[in-house]
Amino acid sequence: MRTPLIAGNWKMNGSSALVDAFGQAFADADLPESVEVVVHPPFPYLDAARRALAGGPVKLGAQTLNPLHAGARTGEVSGRMLKEFDVEYVLVGHSERRELYRESDDDVYDRLLAALNADLRPILCVGETLEARDAGRTRDVVLRQVGHALAPLEPAQRARVTIAYEPVWAIGTGRTATPEQAQEVMAAIREYQAGFDPALAQSMRLIYGGSMNAANAAELLAQPDIDGGLVGGASLKVDDFLAICHSAR
């Protein structure tokens, strides 16, 4: 049985007031015990979020990390540093990082490995552009990204990874993959995994990211191979994010 995971990615948004609002809301929220919830605020709010969420059901995540433990990398943050703030999860390979910061598949793998070595739980983001989808290359693009990141890992390392399928054309656009489109890709990822590790294919969580909101979450989460969501804009609205969490029960 795979535990549903709802992860809120604030991106470069939020404020101290929002951190406090989340802390208060989730302290009083009756979250389903069967659902795991994580929030990924920007780096400056990690400590405030740690304190605001302390003792509650919500775990803390980061949005990226540098592959190195330390060094001359101005503006960067290492996995070791994140652990000091009680961070448990970290995103790697988000489409915005791949596109805006030119992170290659090799870069994503390096960050994934760094996260695992720092005892963090990486959420590996994969997905295709609209051009690739229209060309019928969705499966090829997504499975290439998955394989490049996971194939070199040991089985115990792969077991710590969650995969987030985020069609690039559905991020921040208001467009959403239909439940059937999302399920088709998730099933392909699970089938690919089964080719070299059948047990892991059944236990690995696959979550959907791409304009998931309170209105469409239940239908997406009802698909057999969708085990949760990587939520962007809706994660900045406390009530909407709570509603999505309840949809995953």
From Swiss-Prot:
Annotated S-S bridges: none
Any one GO molecular-function label of the UniProt entry: triose-phosphate isomerase activity
Keywords: Cytoplasm, Gluconeogenesis, Glycolysis, Isomerase
EC number annotated for this UniProt entry: 5.3.1.1
Pathway: Carbohydrate biosynthesis; gluconeogenesis; Carbohydrate degradation; glycolysis; D-glyceraldehyde 3-phosphate from glycerone phosphate: step 1/1
Reactions that this protein is recorded to catalyse: D-glyceraldehyde 3-phosphate = dihydroxyacetone phosphate
GO cellular component: cytosol
Main subcellular location: cytoplasm
Record keyword Secreted present: no
Binding site for substrate: N9, W10, K11, G172, S211, G232, G233
Subunit field text: Homodimer.
UniProt protein name: Triosephosphate isomerase
Species this protein is from: Chromohalobacter salexigens (strain ATCC BAA-138 / DSM 3043 / CIP 106854 / NCIMB 13768 / 1H11)
